[in-house]
Amino acid sequence: MDERLSLLRSPPPPSARHRAHPPQRPASSGGAHTLVNHGYAEPAAGRELPPDMTVVPGDHLLEPEVADGGGAPPQGGCGGGGCDRYEPLPPSLPAAGEQDCCGERVVINISGLRFETQLKTLCQFPETLLGDPKRRMRYFDPLRNEYFFDRNRPSFDAILYYYQSGGRIRRPVNVPIDIFSEEIRFYQLGEEAMEKFREDEGFLREEERPLPRRDFQRQVWLLFEYPESSGPARGIAIVSVLVILISIVIFCLETLPEFRDEKDYPASTSQDSFEAAGNSTSGSRAGASSFSDPFFVVETLCIIWFSFELLVRFFACPSKATFSRNIMNLIDIVAIIPYFITLGTELAERQGNGQQAMSLAILRVIRLVRVFRIFKLSRHSKGLQILGQTLKASMRELGLLIFFLFIGVILFSSAVYFAEADDPTSGFSSIPDAFWWAVVTMTTVGYGDMHPVTIGGKIVGSLCAIAGVLTIALPVPVIVSNFNYFYHRETEGEEQSQYMHVGSCQHLSSSAEELRKARSNSTLSKSEYMVIEEGGMNHSAFPQTPFKTGNSTATCTTNNNPNSCVNIKKIFTDV
């Protein structure tokens, strides 16, 4: 044993010391030692390296190392075969995160295809896999002195271009979108790069909806806002749909001659209608009290439900400002305003001894606003939501369509007016009068109420119809593509709703990957919800506390402290 110790402590031969060539030796900070591997051989079985040491391969085999700066020569020797010696570097060397990246080059092997770049290129993004020396060290191959990744080769051209261009991400045309998305996640380019990629590919950013902080408020919000959350929520949605349908039916039926209020439609009511209304059982509505009218009673009940639903949702919503800016909530407000205006007008007429309190035209416009209640059905209809999302995403194309139609209408209405100017039987008395004909012709409707009679006018009409077909056909494929995207996103089981509740903890970036895994591994049915609560807790432990929303159970990870449980919450549901 003493002989072996003396052999290990003996200095190496001078000839070997002169042949040594110092390799790159980045050292880790914090007082940790850096070990230099001088051979291809793996460490002996049972030998483990300390967790705070970084292994850096040397350039030469079976040769001792001479430290830069005149350090003492290493101690130890090599047996016959491969040598497996490690040596702590002097503490004066730079740390791993502070190494000089200017002139050094690195070789990256992607499934047999080698790429060579400079370390300073990778160091531009230290938060990524290739930019962080500690993260990429696990993929280092000491036999070939290169980094090896068994990944998609065509995708790495774009990944390396991301570093070379300073953050520009472009998908190769021969790489599918899903594969390139996985490569972005593997190389840990970050959420910003993923968002840029999705925007360039035409994906819309998924809307994140916050949940209320209080449990009772959250339960009420889910009950009235998300019908799939529980059985009672579906029941409330059914009641709301029935009330909307009843309100629309009443709005239509009260315009029939048998039920029409004569004082509201004096100009449009014929003598036959008066006679029919007089012979009907409800023909005396004009003389009867409006408060006892059956239509008014049913309308009042519908308005009571609409008002109750709107107030409950307003007080339970997580953000009053966001709630007030939502277009669907504005429609709810517009749907109930005409009732209160009509009620106030009726009361004013009673106090004024039957004198008309408001212009009849204004009153009709106010009552017409009631028809917007039909848009309340979109809250409970996926088809209407898809249509609304399609129109919203296609606003640019629709704007171009309207602009093209406007140019065509001006052009062809002017042309047909001058072409028909010499014919006294022509119906085109002016250019604005020809606007209607141009719109009807370009949209290929062709009512026939106005038509050219001269040869020149017919030629203009033919060109107008052809131009209309071409103009309308140009933006239609883009609109159809948007519709297909939203339709398949709804029907292929992708994420339907995403609600985020951000508490005091701000660890958003660390939790994004776990949320994506939970979304991809989700096996929930349409009526089930999974609540993932993350933050300053142990994610691997997952102690669960169920919270009920009707007939569905949501699991909440707690840390023996319910107040600190909710930091980031997302609810996922599959169709």
Swiss-Prot record:
Does the record bear S-adenosyl-L-methionine in its keywords? no
Q: How is it modified after translation?
A: N-glycosylation promotes the cell surface expression.
UniProt keyword DNA damage, yes or no: no
Residues carrying sugar: N279
Residues with PTM Phosphotyrosine: Y499
Assembly with partners or alone: Homotetramer. Forms heterooligomers with KCNE4 which inhibits KCNA3 activity by impairing localization to the cell membrane. The stoichiometry of KCNA3 and KCNE4 in the heterooligomers are 4:1, 4:2, 4:3 or 4:4 respectively. Increasing the number of KCNE4 subunits steadily slows the activation KCNA3 and decreases its abundance at the cell membrane. However, a single subunit of KCNE4 is sufficient for the cooperative enhancement of the inactivating function of the channel. Interacts with SEC24D; this interaction is reduced in the presence of KCNE4.
- Name it: Potassium voltage-gated channel subfamily A member 3
Give the species.
Answer: Homo sapiens (Human)
